[in-house]
Amino acid sequence: MSIERQWGEESASIFTLLKLTDMQKIVFTLLGSLLGFLVFAQDATDLRKKHFNTGDGIAIRGYDPVAYFTQNKAVKGSSEWSTSYEGVTYYFSSASDKEEFRKAPARYEPQYGGWCAYAMGKDGTKVDVDPGTFKITGGKLFLFYNQFFTNTLKSWNKDEPNLHRQADNNWQKLFH
């Protein structure tokens, strides 16, 4: 089947007007597809930059996302060991943590772009966090606001299944 028949008369007329060979048509089609993919990828990166909690351009206020899992505590990272993933920059406390993150970034990224999980679940708002107040559940990192006598991790624990479900829904709405 020729490209003209596969894509319809409008496309066929464009190819015919341009007097392209079959190989040129294939190259033209592939370049168009690649351009579309690059535009989509850039949009996704821009969306992450817009919605992730990156004060001073750094995620989790510079804390090492891998250390939450390996040391079960918040450990300050360093610009010496930094990497960017889809437009978001992370700091690490060691070269090995940086390498571990690069192997599986989605495994270590905090949920809800690093915003307070409780606030995202309660009303879909982006509230800053205390990197030292966290919970790992189901292999995922959740961060919480903890200032001025308010520790939202305690509130989250009281109704975690409902808040978690609602936070997932609210976070998805930000990306559509």
Predicted regions and their residues:
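Mature extracytoplasmic domains of secretory-pathway proteins
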Residues: Y91-S93, D97-E109
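Bacterial Sec-dependent N-terminal signal peptides
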Residues: M1-A44
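Intrinsically disordered, low-complexity terminal tails and linkers in eukaryotic proteins, enriched
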Residues: Q42-E86, Y108-H176
